[in-house]
Amino acid sequence: MPTKRQLCKHEDDGWADLNGLVESLGPEQMEEPGYYPDWSVKDLVAHLAAWMAEAARILTQVHYGTYLKRDLDVDAMNKDFYEANHDLPLPVVRAEAFAARNRMLAEMNAIDEVIPEAEDWFEESGPRHYQEHLPRLREWVQELQGRG
């Protein structure tokens, strides 16, 4: 099992790639639909933030020994996250993403022993999740910048 330092380094590398692409866009580009048909880059950032916040919540439970595994309806959660965040202003979405990431990292750091569930939540909500979305984000950023 990787150490916390290795897990956080993996997350930091993925975040740097993702955030670099996001920051290469102007505010109007971040809000233009097309990342997915109805999603903008802002919606993607909100989506990632929601899952990082969920991971932070779970990691807190792991830290205090109150974590109970439960089945998730990921599609329903994604829909709820989208509906809750879609109309938020871009600066709020970006601030929430940075806050959620910081909390996720802090909660991971607070855990005495990284158990498999903690590793899974951290990886799935952080670096693996970034990797899942990076290919399409790279394409969409190229398309947006090519219009300029």
Q: Which role fits each region the language model picked out?
A:
Residues M77-E117:
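Acidic/histidine-rich alpha-helical segments that form the ligand environment
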Residues D12, E31-A76, N109-G148:
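Short, contiguous alpha-helical
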